[in-house]
Amino acid sequence: VAKSGNTGNVFDLGELRRLVDELGSGSREARAAVLDATSPDDKDCDCPGCGTEVLTFPPVVLAPDDELAAAVLRVPLVLDAQRLAAWTGTREVTPEGLLPDPFLPCAELGVPNPARLHLLWVVAVNTGMVRISRGVATAGPLALSAELPSAALLGFWDGVVMDVLDRADDSLTGSSVVDDHLAEMLATMYAVSDGLSPATLVKGILQSHEVACEARPAEMRALTAALPGELQGALSLLGYCGLIELSGAGWPRLTPLGMWAVRQDLLREGHDAPTGAEVAVFADLGAAELVEAIMKRSAAPSAVTVWLESRSPEAAARELVKIAASGTAGQRGTVGTILEELGPEAEVPLREALSEPAMWRYAASWLHIRDLPAPALTPADSTWIAVDTLASLIHLGNAPEAMCEFDMLEPGEDLVRVVEEMTSVDHPDTIAVLDLLGAHHSDAAVGKAARKAAMKARSR
């Protein structure tokens, strides 16, 4: 999110899922909290375009813009920044653009400490409440009032939150660990809008810190003892900043302004964070329309969740199988991704798909993964799936992704041998896949084997 440059500030998707599961009685949507990366292993790939982890968050309902705009003017941080700007008037500042004696305004304005004053000063200057020119601070061009358009007030609020979160690099909350994991904590609270218990938040931060920062046991023991108190202080500050409030159950959750601001940040980072209205339009699409929209990238991953929830698992699977059985590799790949969201309730149409020449291998794999009776796949079947997987990515128009996908198909397996075996499977896109590998694969031996295999396939 805003502090994504910090290497310790990571999204541990597995831990987010487990944290959400601990809600127990929460809504299905909240507990599912579909937080999936499009390519979870891309961090190990050097291909262009790989390595960017895109997350999908459940749809949210935002408060109306006019209500949000009115709430901005009541945020304690905003009110104090206005007071500081008024107190400053016309005043000399240091060469760094700071107030020369931070203790004076702290005493006169009742600001608890210089760190809080610095946050207020950053917000006041960056948002235009205060202007600094030639070593002198004066009143800035921004005059906040309820007369401003909602869009202007929300734009101001967006800037305030970016300033707040950027301060995490310089001890925003007073806890270095909370600062390091602030973005993922806010994203988790965004995904579970009803709130999370402090104990759950502490557990998530500890687990993420241990994994992402490779913390030693002694550090973890000390952190386990100190973090609950540090988190309480951090939540109090975030409440002062207008981001956090307590739910009816006493659990911290994002305020309506917090939901709006965190969503803006997620969208800036390229994540899928839709509103309910944005994805509701996909519920009534047919399977063919949904698959086409996904392939054209006009439907975000969250649209799949809405589409599946609007029909029974069996009905959804039957529609999807029909598309995949008669469609292209690109359609099969897209359908396969959607089918992975379904459980054993969809068994009947998947079992029926075992009679479809282009679909039976995927159906067998789907059944096997869910511990349901299924025919065994031979090595030749695995090679066919490899060809089809690469072909699906070609249909989606991303050759670099295809290179990454090929490297991940069979970790540790001799890729040259797999390429050579591709000529023996009956797949309409075999030559196109071999041409792709021959032209773009980073391993010279694999590329050479692919070009040779393509010539062999053409000679048949």
Language model features by range: what are they?
Residues 2-223:
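Short, amphipathic alpha-helical interface elements at domain boundaries
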Residues 120-127, 226-245:
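Basic amphipathic alpha-helical segments that dock to polyanions
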Residues 237, 242-280:
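C-terminal engagement modules used by replication, chromatin/transcription, nuclear envelope/ESCRT
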Residues 251, 327-328, 355-361, 426-427, ...:
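Short inter-helical turns and helix N-cap capping residues of alpha-solenoid HEAT/ARM repeat scaffolds
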